[in-house]
């Protein structure tokens, strides 16, 4: 007789088992999507203004911010975001606006609902943004690399412009791939901007990382518009 799984028994045991597992809280905003849209738009405008540029909420910009707002207010969001598109269309500006928005909400204790009081766990949404080349450079400083890969919220700007592999004392390393694998395994929130297409990501990092991205990242594709003058 072939083996058979007792579904009723599995459903009975699963809650007992999962209570003993500490699953990381996933970053989300505890508010309506429209409220998140207005909040993110305000921080986006502030970022643009800080660079002495004119703030324009055209259709593309509004749509991109709205998609981010929808994602970050979902009941069970993925544990990351990827903004894809050509240079100069606002990807980095939106990522920095998101970082400032998270910091502003955290200062007002917005994320206390993500604390796990049973285990005494406090959710700390500290977000750091690094240029992807800084990750490659950290391959020569393992303590720095460990710090980056374990950061609670990490923004990686301009993924794809770095060499896929680097040499360190005769060893061939893939620091970006290793960092992403670690963050995927530990469900750490990762925010990425890139000029690469999905196909180019697969070609550069391999199908394994492309598959990881599909599971961990909500992707927002920016249309071919540039705001740099």
Residue ranges of predicted features:
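Conserved glycine(s) of the Walker
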Residues: 88-91
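Hydrophobic anchor at the beta1->P-loop junction of P-loop NTPases
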Residues: 83
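A short, basic N-terminal segment
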Residues: 1-77, 220, 229
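Hydrophobic positions on the alpha1 helix immediately C-terminal to the Walker A/P-loop
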Residues: 94, 98
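Walker A/P-loop NTP-binding motif
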Residues: 100-103
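Walker A (P-loop) ATP-phosphate-binding motif of ABC ATPase nucleotide-binding domains
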Residues: 80
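Conserved nucleotide-sensing/catalytic segment adjacent to the nucleotide-binding pocket
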Residues: 114-185
């Amino acid at each position: 007789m072939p083996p058979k799984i007792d579904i009723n028994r599995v459903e009975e045991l699963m809650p007992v088992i999962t209570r003993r597992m500490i699953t990381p809280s996933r970053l989300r905003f505890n508010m309506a999507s429209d409220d998140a849209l207005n909040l993110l738009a305000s921080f986006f405008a502030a970022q643009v203004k800080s660079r002495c540029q004119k703030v324009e909420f055209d259709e593309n910009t509004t749509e991109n911010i709205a998609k981010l707002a929808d994602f970050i207010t979902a009941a069970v969001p993925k544990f990351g975001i990827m903004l894809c598109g050509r240079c100069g269309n606002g990807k980095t500006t939106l990522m920095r606006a998101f970082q400032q928005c998270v910091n502003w909400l955290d200062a007002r204790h917005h994320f206390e609902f993500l604390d796990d009081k049973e285990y005494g766990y406090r959710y700390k949404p500290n977000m750091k943004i690094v240029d992807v080349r800084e990750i490659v450079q950290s391959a020569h400083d393992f303590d720095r690399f460990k710090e980056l890969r374990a950061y609670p919220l990490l923004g990686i700007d301009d993924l794809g412009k770095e060499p896929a592999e680097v040499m360190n004392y005769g060893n061939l390393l893939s620091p970006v791939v290793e960092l992403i694998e670690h963050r995927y395994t530990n469900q750490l929130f990762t925010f990425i901007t890139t000029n690469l297409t999905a196909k180019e990501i697969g070609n550069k990092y391999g199908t394994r990382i492309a598959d990881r991205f599909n599971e961990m990242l909500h992707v927002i594709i920016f249309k071919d518009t540039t705001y740099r003058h």
